From Swiss-Prot:
GO terms for cellular component: chloroplast; mitochondrial small ribosomal subunit. It is found in: Plastid, Chloroplast. This is Small ribosomal subunit protein uS2c. SUPFAM superfamilies: Ribosomal protein S2. Gene3D superfamilies: Glucose-6-phosphate isomerase like protein, domain 1 (3.40.50.10490), Helix hairpin bin (1.10.287.610). Keywords: Chloroplast, Plastid, Ribonucleoprotein, Ribosomal protein. One of its GO terms (biological process) is translation. It comes from the Eukaryota.
Amino acid sequence: MTKRYWNITFEEMMEAGVHFGHDTRKWNPRMAPFISAKRKGIHITNLTKTARFLSEACDLAFDAASKGKQFLIVGTKKKAADSVTRAAIRARCHYVNKKWLRGMLTNWYTTETRLGKFRDLRTEQKTGKLNSLPKRDAAMLKRQLSHFETYLGGIKYMTGLPDIVIIVDQQKEYTALQECITLGIPTICLIDTNCDPDLADMSIPANDDAIASIRLILNKLVFAICEGRSSSIRNY
């Protein structure tokens, strides 16, 4: 994997609060190598390590994107949801930003069936077929369509399992992470000071609670994905 320069600066990481970890009483000892200090009762993440692993994650994302690999971005907590949506749309990635439905990947047949039903309902709505049904039936199907749009809207164009999954909050998205581990799908994961760095294939030590921190990390990864896709087109 070729190393590239991704313009990751300490100034922008400090400004985004990437270095702020959790309360020192709520830490995971396995994060010790990524912590540089304690300040006012919280752990401070070593930004040198953050820059290194974020750069490596960007290299991985670039290479995967240049080979046409498919990405899924997962971040369902309120502070991450908007950033996840914007990042995914910008990089043309699939995303989950509301709720991880258990078995979304490990029970792919069921997910695929739901997506098929979702597509059918969207078609029926666009063609006006739903409005021609009895009111009660139309209302029920519209509620179902709304449910699908909320929970499956970000993966409606996904036709198979993703090649790489980017996870914003390891603890919040633990079920998604476990499904990736079960299926052998590589993961890039933001890890705060209360996380386990050994669970993901590529861990980025960073504040996973601050919106600015989440946005910064995702922006770097998205830029790498976009550059990788552009590289693929140029070399075609």
